[in-house]
């Protein structure tokens, strides 16, 4: 399993089927980048200047919304993941 370092978070992208207002399903090439994902691994947290470690605010299993062009896409064990910094997370859903 991927183990993120520091304030990094590993997420699995949640793909949504995109349709136009008239019901046409858009091909992958015309879709927006997904901005929603499920947290699958969390780093140990960010280290402050005084050496204190701040625990991440998200947990494994959380559904999140993140910045549109954030993170680095990686493939591991046949699945696609995104590794991003905690600061790229905009909200936790639910």
Swiss-Prot record:
<dbReference type="GO" id="GO:0051082">
    <property type="term" value="F:unfolded protein binding"/>
</dbReference>
<keyword id="KW-0143">Chaperone</keyword>
<keyword id="KW-0963">Cytoplasm</keyword>
<dbReference type="GO" id="GO:0046872">
    <property type="term" value="F:metal ion binding"/>
</dbReference>
<dbReference type="InterPro" id="IPR020818">
    <property type="entry name" value="Chaperonin_GroES"/>
</dbReference>
<dbReference type="Pfam" id="PF00166">
    <property type="entry name" value="Cpn10"/>
</dbReference>
<comment type="function">
    <text>Together with the chaperonin GroEL, plays an essential role in assisting protein folding. The GroEL-GroES system forms a nano-cage that allows encapsulation of the non-native substrate proteins and provides a physical environment optimized to promote and accelerate protein folding. GroES binds to the apical surface of the GroEL ring, thereby capping the opening of the GroEL channel.</text>
</comment>
<dbReference type="InterPro" id="IPR037124">
    <property type="entry name" value="Chaperonin_GroES_sf"/>
</dbReference>
<dbReference type="GO" id="GO:0005524">
    <property type="term" value="F:ATP binding"/>
</dbReference>
<dbReference type="InterPro" id="IPR011032">
    <property type="entry name" value="GroES-like_sf"/>
</dbReference>
<dbReference type="InterPro" id="IPR018369">
    <property type="entry name" value="Chaprnonin_Cpn10_CS"/>
</dbReference>
<dbReference type="GO" id="GO:0051087">
    <property type="term" value="F:protein-folding chaperone binding"/>
</dbReference>
<comment type="similarity">
    <text>Belongs to the GroES chaperonin family.</text>
</comment>
<dbReference type="GO" id="GO:0044183">
    <property type="term" value="F:protein folding chaperone"/>
</dbReference>
<comment type="subunit">
    <text>Heptamer of 7 subunits arranged in a ring. Interacts with the chaperonin GroEL.</text>
</comment>
<protein>
    <recommendedName>
        <fullName>Co-chaperonin GroES</fullName>
    </recommendedName>
</protein>
<dbReference type="GO" id="GO:0051085">
    <property type="term" value="P:chaperone cofactor-dependent protein refolding"/>
</dbReference>
<dbReference type="GO" id="GO:0005737">
    <property type="term" value="C:cytoplasm"/>
</dbReference>
